[in-house]
């Protein structure tokens, strides 16, 4: 039995694979303006977010301190979103061409942690808490809209409108406006957690839903565009390549691995801003 559980890939190995793919993707993201970075970097990078999502599902399910787990993800996501907000509204620290990073995957994960906890409360028949947690995430955008409709003068007050914009961008983000991942990523995260424990069903449903969201729906919309050819689904609309991550997920052996958990948390913001800073310097040299 021990030999069987040791076969495949553990959590650390999956995260390492995802990390390498993420770096390739972000090299393309930040240095695409040079025209020297192959698109295949971005294509390979499509697998990184699903793998990190899968690992986060497992991490949340196994952690002994969910509150600390959540706060760590929330804090990193909030800090990165606050800097993004500053870049958007103060137009500070932007690259010479106006570009600034829109990397907010930790905010997606933060919202998902709340929903996952809600799912567990429902399983424990704590219906009020479970429904409340899930409803808080789902209904928050509508609460904001209702608030702005009831108090339209807020949008005409510079300070008040800025505060509201900051709140819904950084500490209390809305699932409908996060700049990274998108609704299909969030839906995939809910499915992975809700179906956890039935690996084949879990990954089959996830792969089918993501294929529908990232291939079938974009293909249907792209077909309406003049000049579109189906091969563009492999050259331009390749977000659906992330479905291939299911093959690596199937190899997960249920083991956490050797650790390095702090590395994976802090590497994300560190490499984003290092690559962004390098791209700003290179842009200034080349312009």
Task: Label each PLM-derived region with a short phrase.
Residues 1-287:
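Alpha-helical transmembrane segments and their immediate juxtamembrane cytosolic regions
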């Amino acid at each position: 039995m021990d030999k069987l559980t040791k076969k495949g890939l553990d959590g650390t190995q999956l995260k390492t694979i995802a990390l390498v793919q993420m770096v390739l993707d972000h090299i393309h993201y930040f240095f695409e303006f040079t025209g020297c970075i192959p698109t295949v970097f971005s294509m390979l990078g499509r697998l990184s977010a699903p793998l990190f999502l899968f690992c986060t599902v497992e991490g949340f399910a196994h952690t002994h301190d969910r509150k600390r787990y959540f706060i760590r993800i929330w804090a990193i996501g909030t800090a990165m979103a606050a800097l993004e907000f500053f870049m958007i509204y103060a137009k500070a620290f932007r690259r010479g061409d106006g570009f600034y990073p829109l990397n907010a995957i930790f905010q997606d994960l933060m919202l998902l942690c709340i929903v996952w906890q809600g799912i567990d409360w429902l399983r424990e028949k704590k219906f009020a808490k479970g429904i409340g947690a899930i409803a808080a995430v789902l209904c928050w955008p509508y609460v904001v809209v209702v608030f702005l409709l009831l108090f339209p003068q807020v949008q005409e007050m510079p300070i008040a409108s800025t505060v509201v914009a900051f709140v819904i961008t950084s500490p209390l983000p809305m699932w409908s406006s996060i700049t990274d991942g998108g609704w299909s990523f969030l839906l995939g995260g809910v499915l992975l957690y809700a179906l956890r424990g039935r690996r084949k069903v879990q990954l089959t449903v996830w792969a089918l839903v993501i294929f529908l969201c990232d291939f079938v729906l974009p293909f249907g919309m792209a077909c309406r565009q003049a000049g579109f050819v189906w091969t563009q689904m492999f050259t331009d609309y390749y977000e659906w390549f992330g479905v291939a991550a299911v093959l690596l997920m199937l190899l997960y052996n249920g083991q956490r691995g050797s650790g390095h958990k702090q590395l994976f948390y802090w590497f994300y913001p560190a490499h984003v801003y290092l690559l962004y800073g390098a791209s700003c310097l290179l842009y200034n040299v080349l312009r």
